[in-house]
Design a protein with these regions (language model features):
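Short beta-strand to alpha-helix junction loop
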Residues: 98-107, 131-140, 177-196, 205, ...
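Internal hydrophobic alpha-helix adjacent to the cofactor/substrate pocket in enzyme cavities
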Residues: 46, 50, 384-404
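Extreme N-terminal leader/targeting segments of oxidoreductases
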Residues: 1-33, 51-52, 56-57, 83
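Glycine-rich FAD pyrophosphate-binding loop
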Residues: 50-73
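Helical element adjacent to the flavin cofactor pocket in flavoenzyme catalytic cores
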Residues: 146-147, 173-231
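Flavin (FAD/FMN) cofactor-binding and adjacent substrate-gating region
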Residues: 2-7, 14, 84-88, 112-193
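Active-site substrate-recognition segment that forms the wall
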Residues: 76-78, 116-124, 210, 227-267, ...
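Glycine-rich active-site loop/strand segments that organize a redox cofactor
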Residues: 73-102
Length: 439
């Protein structure tokens, strides 16, 4: 069975203090409910289920440490809406609006949890800035403007000089700022905080990868040192679901790479200028770079792609991505020409996304006693949080407009198996990387 095999580094996680010792599955544990996967979806599902069923014992199992895996490896955007400019005009405006409501719901849940539990993750309601650095991006920005108008969301167009005021970079030709719909944070810190503040009737087990799953009523989840037997299993395993026998033809496992620099000195921050409180940039062009400047003065650069969970720990792919990130930072801030000798990269890592053909989602009852929320499509922090809460609502029989929105999202379209899937995916990723002058 293919288990999570992330590289032994995650920049967001590595800058945190050491966590408390992990509790691991040991012996036989018998419970009514088990949630598998403690990313944002599983954390949300376990919390919501525990709130609905305060007298029931719920187990949450994570293969690694909470925050170290996929949910702690993204760029740190909690997107209250997400679409591509190339998708405008929308083929199905009602479905796009449903996606936006679901994302906004997840954003609101997380913002409240971070505030109520005083989770230290650098949360900043900064919004997001779509940026362009050429003709492809400019055309896509026009589509984004139309899309936000369709959704009734305010967005302000920025020229090159206005973008430079924010970023300290003359690399960009235009931008589109969307206020109030995106939180910025350290995803590993946020996930750890969510795991540390779960309701008292949730028991979290970490470093407990499930080596074998015996489906049934009850289901039996077997780890190296024990087993969990549960009447109800909630699968929140995303791209690792095929290893457990689910969603084998639903997703492409795409690895996105990121690097995080050391904190800039006051002199370096003054040298590049821009908003010293931090910002978040999303590329308008496909294959462009996602960029963060953190409150402590680090630069995060995210671009370059791989295929399959194994590529998160592929040393050659990590080295290639790191070189690309250095080049991308130099393009944006040429004053840092001595980058390798000065503002060095401290961490480079990969995170694997589950991408479907049609932005579809596996949601609901998979079979008797087994439920699932699977398929992130690269925007999982807010949507995963919302879908996790909604799967718990569905299990206990609660209904809502948001649950109806979630149920309106189609199932993923069928994908061919490897090696065909891998071959096509690699060709498309290579073409996208070569075509983008905006990386």
């Amino acid at each position: 069975m293919q288990l999570p095999n992330n590289a032994a580094t995650n920049g967001w996680y590595n800058v945190l203090p050491d966590p408390s010792p992990a509790k691991q599955v040991s012996g036989t544990i018998r419970v009514p409910y088990v949630v598998l996967g403690a990313g944002v979806t599983g954390l949300s599902a376990a919390r919501q289920l525990a709130t609905h069923l305060p007298d029931e014992e719920i187990v949450l199992i994570e293969a690694e440490r909470v925050g170290f895996g996929t949910s702690g490896r993204n760029s740190g955007f909690v997107l209250g809406n997400h679409f591509h400019g190339g998708d405008v005009p929308f083929e199905n405006p009602a479905l796009v609006a449903a996606h936006a409501r679901l994302s906004r719901g997840g954003l609101n849940i997380l913002r409240k949890l971070v505030t109520d539990h005083e989770i230290e993750c650098g949360w900043h309601d900064w919004g997001k800035l779509h940026v362009s650095a050429g003709a492809e991006g400019d055309a896509t920005l026009n589509g984004l403007v139309q899309g936000y108008e369709t959704l009734g969301i305010q967005a302000k167009e920025l020229d090159a000089d206005e973008v430079a005021v924010v970023t300290g970079s003359s690399f960009y030709t235009a931008g589109l700022k969307v206020e109030g719909t995106t939180g910025l944070m350290n995803p590993a810190a946020m996930c750890r905080g969510l795991g540390e503040t779960l309701p008292s009737n949730v028991t979290l087990y970490e470093i407990s990868p499930v080596h074998r799953l015996e489906r049934g009523q009850p289901s039996r989840l077997i780890t190296a040192n024990g087993e969990v037997i549960a009447d109800h299993l909630i699968m929140c395993t995303n791209i690792f679901s095929p290893a457990l026998g689910f969603s084998k033809s639903d997703m492409v496992p795409v690895v996105a790479y990121a690097s995080l620099t050391r904190p800039m000195t006051a002199l370096e921050q003054a040298e590049i200028g821009g908003d010293a409180n931090g910002f978040g940039l999303l590329p308008a062009a496909h294959g462009g770079s996602t960029v963060r400047r953190t409150p402590d003065g680090r630069i995060l650069m995210r671009n370059s792609f791989g295929y399959g969970p194994g590529d998160t720990s592929n040393s050659a792919m990590l080295a290639r991505a790191r070189a690309n990130h250095i080049e991308s930072i130099k393009k944006r801030w040429p004053k840092l020409q001595d980058f390798e000798m000065g503002l060095e990269i401290e961490h480079t890592w990969g995170g694997v996304l589950g991408v479907t053909r049609n932005s579809g989602h596996v949601f609901g009852q998979i079979e008797k006693g087994i439920w699932g929320s699977i398929g992130c499509n690269g925007a999982n922090v807010a949507r995963g949080t919302m879908s996790g809460a909604l799967i718990a609502d569905m299990i206990v029989g609660n209904t809502s407009d948001l649950l109806s929105d979630q149920q309106s999202v189609p199932r993923p379209k069928w994908m061919p198996p490897d090696p065909f899937r891998k071959m096509v995916a690699r060709q498309r990723m290579k073409k996208m990387e070569k075509a983008s002058a905006e990386r």
